[in-house]
A protein has these predicted regions:
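Glycine-rich phosphate-binding loop signature in dinucleotide/nucleotide-binding domains
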Residues: 20, 93, 153-155, 222-228
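N-terminal helix-turn-helix DNA-binding module of bacterial transcription factors
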Residues: 1-36
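Hinge/beta->alpha junction and helix N-cap segments in small-molecule ligand-binding domains
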Residues: 46-59, 79-85, 135-144, 161-218, ...
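Short acidic capping loops at alpha-helix termini that bridge into adjacent secondary structure
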Residues: 156-157, 201-202, 254-260
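Alpha-helical recognition/docking segments in bacterial nutrient-uptake
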Residues: 35, 39-152
Length: 311
């Protein structure tokens, strides 16, 4: 109880502790005694290396970290492993007072583990869960805006390059049945936004993750089909960067031969060659809102209505 000590006595105690190499109470023991860890768990849908290569995720994470750090909380990262999310035992062992889930599939087992522990939960993007705090953007509206822009330019032959519909590692063309049963709300909404303008017969290439390498392969496959699309709608900027490379691989030019639109507006978009046209979503703001919701739940607040940010 340092408040009951004189300043001089407190200073002597601290000097003695420092000379003995005592750094203070053991954090694990302290958390057991107080039943609080001052930590926010962050559940990822993929491994750490893939996550840190995702520019959009990095910006969201920065917004979240800056918010909780300002209230003396730390972040505990729980990388995805099985079926698009952390293993349940990872969640069970994690020292966290509240959990933020980032883009997990609807049936991620990690979500059941969070509920079993009775921890407050905040969702960024997906899944949609009842009575759960959530931050999202208008994915359908943003995708529809992108497709409408290209339609207004006169394009009628489209191709779509998207990230995963299911956490099963599939790369290839999407069948109507696979589209109808997708496990990811964001993927579903963006595809519905695109196809609402271009038509349900538009070819859609699925990439197992949002990466330039897979976007390049998917775009190349679409651009070598007959008839060749004159416009590609990419569900992320990372996929769009890969599509730009595929266009160069085939000796084509943007926008003379093919138009490309991404989604995210990461900083690298304006430095691409040519600069990438993209749908902007407020990534840092999304992370900050999630952090504010997590802190509110820790203070006993209610989840409230989902927060939808404009694109």
């Amino acid at each position: 109880r340092p408040d009951q000590l004189s300043a001089a006595l407190r200073e002597r105690i601290l000097e003695t502790a420092a000379s003995m190499g005592y750094a203070g109470p053991d954090p694990v023991a302290r958390s057991l005694a107080t039943r609080h860890s001052a930590a926010v768990g962050f559940m990822l849908g993929q491994g750490l290396s893939a996550s840190f290569a995702d520019a959009a995720l990095s910006i969201v994470l920065d917004g979240l970290a800056s918010t909780v750090d300002g209230h003396d909380h730390c972040l505990v990262l729980m990388p995805g492993r099985d079926r698009g999310g952390p293993r349940p035992e990872t969640v069970t062992r994690a020292q966290a007072d509240v959990v933020v889930a980032y883009s997990l599939p609807d049936d991620a087992p990690a979500l059941t583990a969070v509920r079993a522990r009775g921890l407050p939960l905040v969702v960024i993007d997906q899944p949609v869960l009842p009575d759960t705090a959530r931050v999202e953007v208008d994915d359908f509206g943003g995708a529809r805006l992108a497709a409408s822009s290209l339609w207004g330019m006169g394009h009628r032959r489209f191709g779509v390059v998207t990230f995963a519909l299911h956490p099963d590692g599939h790369n290839g063309l999407v069948t109507p049945a696979r589209l109808a049963s997708t496990s990811f709300r964001v993927t579903r909404d963006r595809l519905h936004g695109y196809l609402d303008v271009t038509g349900t017969d538009t070819p859609v290439w699925e990439c197992a993750r949002s990466s330039r390498e897979l976007g390049r392969a998917g775009a190349r496959s679409l651009l070598t089909s007959n008839p060749r699309p004159t416009a590609l709608l990419c569900a992320s900027d990372e996929l769009a960067f890969g599509a730009l490379q595929a266009v160069r691989d085939l000796g084509l030019r943007v926008p003379t031969d093919v138009s490309i639109i991404g989604f995210d507006d990461v900083p690298a978009a304006e430095h691409a060659d040519p600069p990438l046209t993209t749908v902007r979503q407020p990534l840092a703001e999304k992370g900050r809102h999630a952090g504010e919701l997590a802190l509110r739940l820790l203070d006993g607040g209610r989840p409230g209505e989902p927060t939808r940010l404009p694109v």
